Amino acid sequence: MNRSLNSANFPHLFFAGRTRLTLRNNEKGTHIRLKVVQKKTRIEGKLVGTNRFYLYTSILNDGDTGWDFAATFFQDSKNYSLGKEHTQGSHIHKVVHFIQRALREPAVLDAMGAALFHEGKCCRCGMGLTHPASIMLGIGPDCIKSMPPSFITDLITVIA
C-alpha cells in the first residue's frame, strides 16, 4: 500500500531515521525499495543518532525478506561508501549513485521520471500513519516536531 510523496522532501525523509521508500521508474514501470536505518550509538546510557545511515535495497515484492545491504550514507556530505558485496559499475552502484544525486538535488527525481512512495509508516519512528496529513507527508504528528527546521521550510515552499 504505497502512498505518493513529493520528491522535494526526499533528502529529509531519507535521513529521518527509519525510512522505507519506493522509487518507481515511470517510464519502464520498474521499482526499487529502499530501507534506510540510522546508526545509533550509546552516550551516557542514551541512544543517540549518528551521521551514518545504512541503505538496504530490495527489488522484490516479498515483504521483509530480500533486503540487501547497499551502502552507508553520511548525512553531512551526502557521500556514500558502497557495500563490500558490490563493485563499481554494478547495478546497485548505479542505483546508489542516483540516490546520491537525488539527495543533493531532489529535482533529479522528477527530471528522470522517478516517482517517490512510502509504505504508510512514519519515516522517523516506523509506526503506522493514520492521520491524512501525516500520510501525505510521510512523518507522524509527534515526529514532525523532531525534524529539522529546514523540513518545515521546504514543506511550505512545496505546498504553496
Segments from the language model and where they lie:
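Short, flexible, mixed-charge glycine/proline-rich loop motifs
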Residues: 108-119, 130-134
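Short Cys/His-rich "knuckle" micro-motifs
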Residues: 130-136, 150-153
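General detector of N-terminal leader/presequence modules that precede the first folded domain
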Residues: 1-51
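Short, surface-exposed polybasic-aromatic patches that bind anionic ligands, especially phosphate groups
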Residues: 85-94, 104-114, 157
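Short metal-binding segments enriched for Cys and/or His
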Residues: 147-159
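Interaction interfaces in information-processing and related assembly proteins
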Residues: 31-95
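Short cysteine-rich clusters marking metal-coordination/redox-active sites
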Residues: 122-125
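Cysteine-rich micro-motifs
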Residues: 135-146
